[in-house]
C-alpha cells in the first residue's frame, strides 16, 4: 500500500509569546501543497527478514538521519506500542526538500500513521491520530487531515502548532493560482538561533483573518516573523523573495523557519527555473 505525504506552506507565522516550558506560542495558517514524498509499506515476509519491526529504506533526496531515527519509524513504533501491528518493510522516496520549513518529515510521520490505520484497520479516528501525531512533532497533527488537492484542508494553528482549527478563505482565494517554491541547498537555517533573535509579540491582525482577504492585500499585512532575523543571517534568501516579486508574484514569503521561499502567481510564470538555476525550484498549480 502506498501514500503520498504532502508538503505545506505557512501563510503568515507570528510568534506571540514565550511559554514557561521554553517553547513559543505561535499563530499560523498551514496550507497543503501538491509537492509530495512517496511512502509504501509491505508486510515483512520470511524471504526478506529484518532485525527491526519496521525496516525502512529511504531513497531520493538525502535525509540527515539514519533510518531507525526517522519519524516514519518513530510513528510505527508509537502505534505498535498500543496496537498489534505486523512487522513491515517501508520505502520512503524523498522529494520534499529537508530543513526547508515545508513540513516534509512531519508529513511522512503523519501519513505513516494514516497508512497503518488504513492498512491494518485500526479504526483510530482522526482525532486520536492527531494526538499520536502531535507526540512526534508540533506540526505533525496537521498532516492527519491535509489533502494537497483540497485547499479547504488548510488549518489555523495556535499553541506550538498542535492546536488546529479549520480556516475558510485561503482555499477559495488560491484556487487556480500557481505556486513556485525555491530552496537553496547550501543554506541551513538554525531554528534555535532564529527564535533567539525574535521578540514575541501579538500581531496587529491575526493571520487567520488576513488570509480571508483578497490575496492582493497579503503583501502588506501577512508576515512571517522569522524572515527578519533569518534574512539578516542569510541575505540570499531575501534576494530570492524579491526576485519572485519581480517575476510577478502577488505574494511571496518564507515558509516556516526556512529556508524555502515561495511565491504565489496569478498566471504560470515563464522560464522561472532559469532564474533559480542550481536551486530546488518547483512550480505547481493550486
Residue ranges of predicted features:
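Short, hydrophobic beta-strand segments that form beta-sheet elements in well-ordered domains
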Residues: 73, 261-265
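Residue-level signal for inorganic ion chemistry
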Residues: 11, 39-41, 72, 105, ...
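Short, basic/glycine-rich phosphate-binding loops at helix/coil junctions
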Residues: 47-65, 112, 134, 214-223
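ATP-dependent small-molecule kinase catalytic core of the GHMP/sugar-kinase superfamily
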Residues: 2-5, 12-14, 18-25, 122-250, ...
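ATP-binding N-lobe of GHMP and related small-molecule kinases
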Residues: 1-100, 117-127, 154, 172
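Short, solvent-exposed beta-strand edge segments and adjacent coil->beta transition regions
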Residues: 53, 177-179, 258
